[in-house]
Design a protein with these regions (language model features):
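Hydrophobic transmembrane alpha-helices and immediately adjacent juxtamembrane helices
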Residues: 1-142, 146-258
């Protein structure tokens, strides 16, 4: 065990640094996203819950919770990793990491840890806040665990990739505001995609976040707009593709080496 820890000393040190970066600014990185998402539950769930009684037989204020948790977690893990990697490139700190006796997969994994830690803290905190006002069950814990794991792998790797390719802070923010946020809302956070008319119903099935969101909702509530097997399969393929892409970048040094 001691020998294993010694061989992975660089991985552990860089992972601790990324996690500490999140915890040091917890009011901004964790508390603020929890508060903003909890306001969605209060404003949309409790205010509209009196008018929109049920969706798929589930109270509206309960129905929106899994989607809001998913949206908060994927935004957090992407934002954290894209910002961390871009800043490391901008400050030339990443050059020191690349020169360290670490394997490419170790660097890739360590730089992803911060986003995963941040997302898990936000997800747990938001669920705790939601349970204070609504009764949210967990019907399928294994499916929920798999869905959350795939979501974090997918968007933590995606954040690393964008951080490597970005040429300015605007580029990282662009992906959040123009890609992730709209796709999250259009993925069915506040509604069931089955209620949409054609062709919007079919178009929604081309949205990757739609599958993640429905897999998480199935884990919580036992309901989904699409087969949970298909949701996990699509999410797994996308996560594997993002991991392969980010691993290739670190293995080849593309856009990393000065």
């Amino acid at each position: 065990m001691t020998e294993l820890v010694a061989r992975r000393r660089g991985l552990l040190a860089l992972s601790r640094r990324e996690a500490h970066r999140v915890l040091k600014l917890w009011t901004q990185t964790v508390a603020a996203p929890i508060l903003s998402s909890f306001l969605f539950i209060l404003v949309f769930g409790l205010s509209l819950g009196g008018r929109i009684k049920h969706i798929d037989g589930i109270d509206y204020d309960v129905f929106i919770v899994p989607g809001l948790i998913t949206m908060a977690m994927i935004q957090a893990t992407y934002a954290n990793n894209s910002a961390s990697v871009f800043q490391a490139r901008f400050d030339r700190y990443l050059n020191d990491v690349l020169a360290a006796p670490m394997r490419p997969w170790e660097i890739n994994l360590a730089l992803s840890i911060g986003g995963v830690v941040r997302a898990l803290l936000i997800g747990a905190g938001l669920l705790a806040c939601a349970l204070a006002v609504v009764d949210v069950p967990i019907q399928h814990p294994l499916a929920l665990t798999a869905a959350v794991a795939l979501a974090l792998v997918l968007f933590s790797s995606f954040g690393v990739i964008v951080g490597i390719y970005a040429s300015s802070w605007d580029h990282t923010a662009f992906v959040t505001n123009i890609v992730i946020l709209p796709l999250s809302f259009l993925g069915g956070v506040f509604y069931s995609v089955d209620t949409l008319p054609s062709p919007w119903h079919e178009i929604s099935h081309a949205n990757p976040i739609f599958y993640l969101l429905n897999a998480v909702r199935y884990g919580f509530l036992g309901t989904s707009d699409v087969s949970v097997g298909l949701s996990l399969a699509v999410s797994g393929v996308l996560a594997a593709a993002m991991v392969a892409w980010s691993s290739w970048l670190f293995r080849t040094g593309h856009r990393l080496k000065p």
